[in-house]
Amino acid sequence: MLNTAFKLHSQGKLDEAEKIYREILDKEPENAQVYNLLGLIKLTKKELDVAEKFILKALSIKKDAYFYENLARVYEYKQDYETEIKVLEKACEEVHCGFEIYFILALAYKNNIEYKKSEKAYLKALELNPKSEKACFNLASLYLFLNSPEKAIEYFKKCLEINPNDKEVLYFLSLGYFRTKNYETGTKYFENRLCRGTAITSQEVTYPHLMQKAPLWQGEDISNKTLYTYYEAGFGDMIMFARYIPTLQKRCKKLLIKPQKELSQLFRDNFPDVEVMDLFYEENKTNFDVHIPFLSIPYVLGLKNDEIFMQHNKYLSATPDKIQYFKEKYFNNNKFKIAIKWQGNTYYETDRVINVEAFAPLFELPNKIYSAQTFEGAEEFTKLANKYDITDLSKDFKDFSYTAGALENVDLVISSDSSLAHLAGAMGKPCIILLPYNYNWRWHMDLSHCDWYDSVKLFRLGEKENWNELMKRIAKTI
């Protein structure tokens, strides 16, 4: 009966398997294995309390590492990491534990913000199974998270010893090199991002005629050719890498750029000699000789280390008419004007979302505060408007050229790591970027200076600090 039930279980026929498991328990009420298997069925169905009950019953009959592992997963699903850790630590005390227990324990420690213990558990897991790519990868990622890029690079390389062709590892290895400002090596490995879930991966959907139309540019002489470059990531990346457009113009006869439609007018205003294409312009209806994804530009240009930060002072600006429009409508006052943004695009990262009420210390200062929040998170504006004097600019942000017009009128921008922060930096506007503890690859180990933008200051969340505490620190510096 057990073999039949287990086969049904393996085939995903959970109700049929459960029925037989219960019949077995009627005859064998102390069968720990069956209680554990029933727990796994309930875990699969997300019936967590019932799963917990069954697996605890299994453990009361027999102490088994696999049972402890499954019980830990119940608490992981519940996001009760403290209890999960207690279960796994108890397993290590009571039974012989192998690789999987220590691997899960390392994950639990990380989720519970116990990073040193997480590191120790991963190292123990690797001691038990040195060829585990997932343990090497997670430990490397932990080191990257903890701003220890040299150790991250070491363990990403160990992953490659196990699986030399893992594009995901090669991509994350590039982020380690970026943190150390080794861009010559980092940009080479960064090309592996094109094998991940980006717009370029889905070229047949986003750019259906691209590969058939012309070859990728590999850095060869194109002085008599037309180059086409196109977006592949977020607004902030396009703004940050727009610094290379003048260099590209010098390399080719004609330059075509396809940014997102929200950036098109800003690029037209700043690069009048470049043909800026509309979002759904069809590649098969225009002429170009070679093409390149926008984030590949530094690599193909052969930029090394600090060369990548060219034009770090100011390379974008707003048009006079839009500056004047916002000045007359919003900025005719003598107060110190601060524009704030609390949330970027959560499609990419969710830890860049800041509780709007964390900005409260700014309202205790004699400033005039403006909201530049758009898209996701804009609904949070009312939480501030109900308590404080704050003006919403976003309803006039038809595209980034309008946003630039507004920013030209403010004295300071305070923003999460978002496109607004990149725009402020590219315009040379004083800007404070609020970084989570696990910050993005674009920022380096030394946060006392922003290499990309001279006008930007970086404030990083402490390991156990909250956004309210960070904002109080910032308020003292204004």
State each model region's role.
Residues 1-412, 417-478:
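Alpha-helical solenoid repeat scaffolds of the TPR/TPR-like class and their adjacent stem/linker regions
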